[in-house]
Amino acid sequence: QWAIFLRNHDELTLEMVTDAERDYMYEEYARDPVARLNLGIRRRLAPLLDGDRRRIELMKALLLSLPGSPVLYYGDEIGMGDNIYLGDRNGVRTPMQWTGGWNGAFSTADPERLYQPLISNPVYGYQAVNVESQRRQENSLLSWTKRLIQVRRSTRVFGRGSIEFLRPANHRVLAYVRSLGAEKVLVVNNLSGTAQAVE
């Protein structure tokens, strides 16, 4: 099986799409030209989706329910942000945010000696978004992600099953059946920003 991922340490490349599709992607996900690199977008998952918890959960649900070996980029399990003002691709390669303490508990070195500076903005900074604080919250993104991973691990069909895409009349809904032997799981994803009817 192939590895599948939502984001990684490189830019989201748009070199294989049409100019119109690239313009749409820039308008939706990289209005600030600083977020663009070459023909791509250099953002982590959470800021790419404007920190919208529902959209982040949807993307992870897709990642963990579709065929392939899912790969989470470090920090995406907690909704870690980026620093697009660092050069090249370094904005998505900042230190892991373990705690809200010194250097996010990534290192005991002086902050200026770190290879990359920690994210320090109020929305995604290590004081606001870190593993330690999310471990204590049952409804945190980290806890939600761990539960979803457990569902995937305990449901064999997600790891090895076939997939059959359904064609609901409502095009805002992506539905498919994962099957392995007698085991079948119906997966229904609402791709819109509002509640949707599905048959």
What positions do the PLM features span?
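Active-site and adjacent substrate-binding regions of carbohydrate-active enzymes
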Residues: 1-199
